[in-house]
């Protein structure tokens, strides 16, 4: 990401450094720029909100988007690439049920329109996590 404002760019770097395994977005900032609300999300967390104090360079948790979801119990979404018969490399995401060996399990393949337009992205998905929790590997092909 390229920020046009050096202060905001540094703030984004500080937040990403403090929350390294999440996709982070500043969703609101005070008019003087000292406080920001940050949403951090991942493949296993639909969103946790933080207050970022720029003067102190501190994050404090405000709350979670879905309190009933324990990220430690959810499955990881891994980016993958494989070659098609015609030699084209196809990107996608593979979610293997947590705590299961990645062999001989049923798989749900989630196709969509394309190759341009709709696509899957790395992040939390209720549907993917539901099927993974029931023992299915989930393959999302872009």
What are the language-model segments listed below?
Residues 11-22, 77:
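A short helix->beta-strand "capping" segment at the edge of beta-propeller domains
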């Amino acid at each position: 990401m390229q920020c046009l404002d050096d202060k905001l760019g540094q703030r984004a770097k500080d937040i990403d450094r403090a929350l390294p395994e999440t996709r982070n977005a500043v969703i609101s900032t005070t008019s003087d720029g000292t406080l920001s609300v940050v949403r951090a999300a991942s493949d296993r967390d639909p969103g946790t909100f933080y207050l970022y104090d720029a003067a102190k360079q501190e994050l404090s948790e405000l709350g979670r988007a879905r309190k009933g979801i324990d990220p430690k119990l959810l499955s990881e979404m891994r980016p993958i690439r494989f070659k098609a018969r015609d030699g084209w490399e196809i990107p996608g995401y593979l979610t293997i049920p947590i705590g299961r060996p990645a062999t001989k399990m049923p798989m749900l393949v989630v196709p969509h329109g394309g190759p341009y337009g709709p696509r899957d992205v790395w992040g939390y998905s209720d549907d993917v996590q539901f099927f993974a929790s029931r023992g299915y590997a989930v393959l999302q092909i872009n």
